[in-house]
Amino acid sequence: MSRILVIGAGGVGVITALSLWLKKESDVSLVVRSDYDRVLKHGYTIESCDYGRLEGWRPHHIYSSVEDAASAADNQGYNYIVVTTKNIIDGPVNSRVSNIIRPVLEKNKELHGPQLTTHILLVQNGIDIEKEIWAEFPREQYRYTVLSGIQLIGSTKIGSGHISQVGQDHLSCGAFDPQDAAAIQAANDFVRMYSNEGQNFVEFDPRVRYSRWKKLLYNAAINTSTALVGLDVPRCLEFGVNKKSTEIEVFHPAMREIIAIAASEGIIIEEEFITMFTEITRKKVFKPSMCVDCEKGQLMELEVILGNPIRIAKRNGVATPTLSILYNLLVLVQAKLKERKGLLKFDEKTATLVDE
């Protein structure tokens, strides 16, 4: 039985742990930070469109930190690390994915050496998110694969230990390196362990990079715009200069720029997805993740969703006027959030940013 550690106990992470637990093909551990005491004592209250209402639910093991999960007396090593935290590469150093998973990789190496391959599944947004892992953990020192998880799920933590899931869980899982046979096998195994027939929808993804560029049509154009204005998508569409102005003047140009950047990388994204993403969000009164993060005063996944694609565009000579406006404005919003958290300091006497 595979041992799986899920890191991130928000709406996505808890439903991920629940789905694995219900399938009964893995031993599931969950890192629960802020809600640890509450969940340890009372478990989770979950209202799920896939699984119904659960009271007092817990996975097989819960830990208050990744370090505790790695150093637990009964830790025999984890076969899978599933990362569902936000990917904030411009945030505090200790929140970078490589630093989050390091204690587990180090412990696995100590316990098993080269005999255990750790499969790192990144259920996160953005493009080029795998490169940090490959850069920080040399293959000659660590034995691991890196897997991609692209999840569409309307799941939110609405209170301490309280999860609401309103959209069916759709997960596609594949290997970032399409030539890595071990990663491909691990992705297929995870699909099997995660699939609860008739409840969630899970599939193996043979074209990870294509899928990630495709999802960026939504994230880079729609998710970002809602964060700037603090509105759900239907209101963005209805509150425009006219009924078509937001999609025609903002959403669609941004999406076409993503298509052009992807094409410069040899990835062809069909134009029909522009209409598809607009239409499926038109009647969903649901605030996307960046909008929610901004309203909660939390840092947004700005760099992996907008920064990385724009850097690729500059490298490949692709014009991105709409994306660049969105990005530069959101950099200011992100800086405001950082200042409130004490991550940036502004000297009002000199009207300059203080270097630390």
UniProtKB/Swiss-Prot annotation:
Q: What is the lineage of its organism?
A: Eukaryota, Fungi, Dikarya, Ascomycota, Saccharomycotina
- Miscellaneous section: Present with 5171 molecules/cell in log phase SD medium.
Q: Does the keyword Cytoplasm apply?
A: yes
What are the record keywords, sorted? Answer: Cytoplasm, Nucleus
For this record, the Gene Ontology CC terms, alphabetical, are: cytoplasm; nucleus
Mention any Pfam family matching this sequence.
ApbA_C
SUPFAM superfamilies to which the protein is assigned, alphabetical:
6-phosphogluconate dehydrogenase C-terminal domain-like, NAD(P)-binding Rossmann-fold domains
Q: Does the keyword DNA-binding apply?
A: no
The main location class comes to cytoplasm
For this entry, the protein name equals Uncharacterized protein YDL144C
- PANTHER family, sorted: 2-DEHYDROPANTOATE 2-REDUCTASE-RELATED, PROBABLE 2-DEHYDROPANTOATE 2-REDUCTASE
Record InterPro entries: 6-PGluconate_DH-like_C_sf, 6PGD_dom2, KPA_reductase, KPR-Related, KPR_N, NAD(P)-bd_dom_sf
Q: Which cysteines are joined by disulfide bonds?
A: none
The superkingdom listed in its UniProt entry is Eukaryota
Q: Where in the cell is it found?
A: Cytoplasm; Nucleus
